[in-house]
Amino acid sequence: MISRKDAIAQIQSNEFDLVVIGGGATGAMVALDAASRGMSVVLLERDDYSQGTSSRSSKMIHGGLRYLENFDVGLVREALLERSLMVELAPHQVYPTPYLVPRLGDDGRDIALGVGLNAYDALATVGVKSDEGPGETAENETLAAAVDRTISWAPERHRTIDGAEAARMMPALAPLNPQSAYLFYDCQTDDSRLVITALQEAERYGAVLLNGADVVEVLDQRGKASGVAFVEQESGDRVEVSAANVVNATGVWADQIRPDGIEDEGEVPLISPSRGTHITLSLDDLPVGEAACIVPAGEGRRIFALPWYGRALVGTTDNDYDGDIDSVSPSQSDVEYLLDAVNTYFETDIAPEQVTGAFAGVRPLISSGDTKKSVDISRKAEMYETSSGMLTITGGKYTTWRRMGKQVVDRIVEREGLSAACRTAEIPLGLPARPEDLETDLDLPDGAIEQLAFRYGHGAREVLDLCAERPELAQPILEGFPDLLAEVVIATRNEQARKVSDVILRRTRLGLLAARDLDSAESVAEVADLMGEELGWSKKRRAEEATLWVDEARREGINPLIRAGR
């Protein structure tokens, strides 16, 4: 990415076809879709890219097996199609994972789940049906071909495996002596890194990207949205952006973008937030091995235990949330709920003190006025067009982010009378690199090469070149983890990281994996120093930024034993 300074200069000196408010997954894909169709695009993010819901997901690219319980067949089919496409477009960042549903003791086979898995298999391979929309036929031809190519990553339907194989795949099951298990496949990713990759592709097509840009007003001319005004957080300056189209892609904040005088209340969605909490655990405490496991969690609920970055990722909860959506952290009861489910199922005794990290996000569910609990509300995306012409896209799920972006840009193309087909079904999200192609004589931490290949793809070479130039940067950010100090420099120089938390929580994910080791200013002092070298911070500013990290970490609740004000 270009620097924030250069981005601001471009914004101030140009008019745009489109301004996108929100730098999460949906906003990133709107920007990429529009820019790749030839539009001039600026994307503005109030805080950091993916700082909201898009960095707090379950890290899964999946069809949503449980949505079949609500008969959301269309949503599941769409998500499964997009899942296959993401494996094609970002093979280094979206990867298949085996999922197990074990049968323990004398438990009978879950017949309903077996039926659901049969439907899941069928929906994953169903042909592509043409939808109406600008450029749709051409895209669906490409999409069908892409699905044909990528479905080979999971060539077999779900099957039943014996208990010994299940225990081999997930050692945590071994003490339980499983009789058998259903085995099926879904995909995992690093959610915030995938957003960064999409944003980099959008910039490659000409989009201008800026974080730390708080949109405070939607401008209008004769009752029509004509741009936005934002406050640049570093300087406090107010900047106006002229744009022919305005898209609100702020997710759970979508109903807060309500410009006075040019919209009716009924023209924007009413968000019903739902909080989802996750925890991470050491593999010594929960050895998940190579597989994910669906874990019963009471009252018909199920949670997941997944391998992720050398930890076991456990989640999620799904509860109505009426707190401050700008400050979402795991509740003590949610952490206890997840631990109770794990301990009950795996017959372990994992205590809160053993939790290596925790995080919570808020899903932007759209309220229908129904009294159903949030777990039963559909995750379908919705687009709203106001009398001002502003488009709002919200709801949905991470897996369908590409299609949500397409839905918005299709509408802009339609009303502008343009001829520009969607191309995002064929635009690679970064370039993959095999770990063996990145071999180096550098003395790197164990696992660093593999992690760099996953996180950056071909861009990992730039990290390694920096390590060769400055060998001290080949050291780990935190002892025992493969994340390199060079990544701090790359994040600051190339990815608009401007706070320690941007690096620790979103460019790397160390804050979610080793929260107890990163709970002091001293623990991130080297990160602050490296960022300061790039951003021109004084010694005093570097110390202040390290202290700000501690405050933010406590607000985020990444270490559930240490919270703000406690």
Predicted regions and their residues:
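Dinucleotide-binding Rossmann-like beta1-alpha1 core, especially the glycine-rich loop
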Residues: 59-165
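Helical element adjacent to the flavin cofactor pocket in flavoenzyme catalytic cores
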Residues: 182-245
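Short hydrophobic core segments
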Residues: 19-21, 241-251
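N-terminal Rossmann-fold NAD(P) dinucleotide-binding loop
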Residues: 27-28
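Glycine-rich Rossmann-fold phosphate-binding loop(s) that bind the pyrophosphate
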Residues: 22-24, 46
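C-terminal accessory subdomains/tails of enzymes that are appended
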Residues: 7-10, 15, 47, 93, ...
